[in-house]
């Protein structure tokens, strides 16, 4: 089935910033997709095209990207008469049309919107659910796997105004028997955490950040881990709910050192620590707390520290590359060669097409890595990644706290998928790193 029309518009994301929405029309109907956007971005990511006009939307307008879809991509794609079921042919066509290594001509946000909408059209043309179509594109077939949600419930770093250097503290309900039960556990721990925070720091500490997590005035990282332990115990899930962290350490890497006081403009350089010292801290906390996954423990180009830490930990925990790998096959190949990590954070907008995202996951799986499909901090109500994580059978998704509708949209879609699959649904649980 060929495409008869492509149309883009500017809409708003969960932070009130403009983003791109694309509609692709075929004889089967109209298929829509919206593009997310990150706050802490890796320098190696594909280019998100913004207008940069300070007087309009604080420089964050995307009307140029929208125009690139409507005036360049749309007529070319309709004329090409490609079959929407052949995702790779469509994506290759888009890449050729752009012609740059980082999608800077048309914008990764323009290209991705089209790519996502085409995938939806392809599923409809085949008459199958989106997760099944995406799974088949990845060479998978059922039974399908429901992911462990990695819920960001405590915020620091660039996502919060407190002193916390590390960006996200997450809960993973690995001890649940189903995704439905996992969401119940996550929700109950989240509410227990809220009451613990309210008692310790007061009502105003219960405001939520971009991804629905709390950002109380925590002074150091261990204090955050203690809060999580307390909330997990209070909800009655000790042993069943584990902890994950996104350190986002590229945000506080300065002159070859790590500044855990980076939010203080008068931070003392003599207190900045080496990668080796930071590694000691990670070893300490992984022995004291039920931590199963650490994302971006080091700067995106500090390969030496990554490789040493992975060798030291001997795969006891998942070490996830995000800024390190940016869902880019070349960066993933480099990380595989240097044995830098054993997990990939998969963000479709870091690379910019569905086909390249699937290839990134396959490359990671081939080296025995785990793959965690992820949202961005600036999200929309689009639920594409919920279907993607099921189709890839990757067993883990990171899409925020059980709070804020743009986060719950993904979790609710996973509830629907689990219900639809019935007895054919398998929850990844404790096997979330290698579920199949």
UniProtKB/Swiss-Prot annotation:
One of its GO terms (biological process) is glycolytic process. It is found in: Cytoplasm. Its EC number is 4.2.1.11. SUPFAM superfamilies: Enolase C-terminal domain-like (SSF51604), Enolase N-terminal domain-like (SSF54826). One of its GO terms (cellular component) is phosphopyruvate hydratase complex. Pathway: Carbohydrate degradation; glycolysis; pyruvate from D-glyceraldehyde 3-phosphate: step 4/5. Gene3D superfamilies: Enolase-like C-terminal domain, Enolase-like, N-terminal domain. Signal peptide: none annotated. Substrate binds at residues 159, 168, 295, 322, 374-377, 398. It is an enzyme of class 4 (lyase). It catalyses: (2R)-2-phosphoglycerate = phosphoenolpyruvate + H2O. The active site is at residues 211, 347. Belongs to the enolase family. Homodimer. This is Enolase. The lineage of its organism: Eukaryota, Fungi, Fungi incertae sedis, Chytridiomycota, Chytridiomycota incertae sedis.
